[in-house]
């Protein structure tokens, strides 16, 4: 029951405070661990395709074991000392694992810059949350990129970690966070990460397979509650949920596009190179600045529904 209470507290603290930059974040430590482990395995394994594939697998095991074991041991000691101490520590961990408020806040920085109408400012703001080249994007392309980011990251930044937290408390939440961070840092198709990042990328796909689809359905339900076009959301999800190189990324993005009645995705430049991508959704209307706060409201509603569902599952597991 303590895990469930910690999740509830962590969720609401996240909504209240987000991720203050003045507080050290565990993902930064996980990132440093990944960098150190990468250097180690690159020295230990041969620089061949097979050698780097194996190195990536060993790296993945090292990082998830350490990232899971450390919080588990800390929580064990805290709960042994006093249940209240354990609850406080686990609540803080749950808060830091979730990213609901920060995802919305970062998108709203883009919205505020767009409202000011200064291209340099809104391009800079969106560059903080997307990986594509932003120097030549116009205002509507920036708006589209911000909406896509909220929609896509609703799953791996909020709903998926919440599911892992509900099932196994903070240690399992950190297990997921470590795996997801490895994919973000190493899961590229270009060298020097193409081979060593293969296992981290594939494991992230596996771990997100069910959460991404749950997130899509929960987002669809949230959109219906908000009065959005749930019928079109369902239609676009059924049609476009595979319109991405990743098996999971288009799940929530397609739902969001359908609910809003806009077209997302399409070709984009990365490091000066054009990447051809299929569109997601139909342009029933032109995308507009207000779609960014709409996506934020959809994110919050989806997160709230997820908390209710996953909290109920956790409650039944401990009954």
Task: List the model feature ranges, each with a label.
Residues 1-179, 187-319:
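Hydrophobic alpha-helical transmembrane segments
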Residues 184:
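Glycine-rich phosphate/dinucleotide-binding loop and adjoining beta-alpha-beta core of small-molecule
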């Amino acid at each position: 029951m303590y895990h469930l209470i910690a999740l509830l507290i962590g969720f609401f603290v996240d909504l209240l405070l987000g991720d203050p930059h003045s507080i050290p974040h565990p993902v930064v430590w996980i990132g440093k661990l990944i960098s150190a482990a990468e250097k180690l395995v690159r020295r230990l394994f041969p620089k061949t395709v097979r050698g780097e594939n194996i190195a990536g697998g060993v790296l993945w095991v090292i990082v998830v074991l350490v990232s899971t074991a450390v919080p588990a041991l800390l929580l064990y000691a805290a709960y042994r000392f006093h249940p209240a101490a354990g609850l406080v520590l686990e609540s803080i961990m749950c808060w830091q694992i979730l990213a609901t408020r920060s995802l919305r806040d970062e998108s709203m920085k883009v919205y505020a810059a767009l409202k000011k109408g200064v291209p340099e400012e809104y391009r800079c703001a969106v560059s903080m949350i997307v990986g594509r080249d932003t120097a030549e994007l116009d205002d509507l392309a920036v708006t589209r990129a911000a909406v896509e980011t909220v929609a896509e990251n609703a799953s791996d930044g909020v709903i998926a970690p919440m599911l892992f937290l509900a099932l196994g408390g903070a240690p399992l939440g950190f297990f997921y966070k470590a795996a997801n961070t490895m994919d973000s840092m190493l899961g590229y198709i270009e060298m020097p990460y193409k081979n060593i990042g293969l296992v981290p990328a594939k494991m992230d796909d596996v771990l997100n397979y069910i959460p991404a689809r749950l997130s899509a359905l929960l987002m669809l339900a949230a959109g219906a509650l908000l009065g959005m076009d749930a019928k079109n959301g369902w239609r676009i999800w059924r049609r476009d949920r595979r319109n991405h190189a990743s098996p999971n990324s288009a799940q929530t993005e397609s739902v969001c596009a359908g609910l809003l009645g806009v077209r997302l995705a399409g070709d984009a430049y990365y490091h000066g190179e054009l990447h051809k991508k299929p569109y997601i959704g139909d342009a029933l209307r032109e995308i507009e600045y207000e779609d960014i706060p709409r996506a934020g409201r959809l994110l919050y509603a989806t997160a709230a529904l997820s908390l209710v569902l996953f909290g109920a599952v956790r409650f039944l597991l401990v009954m």
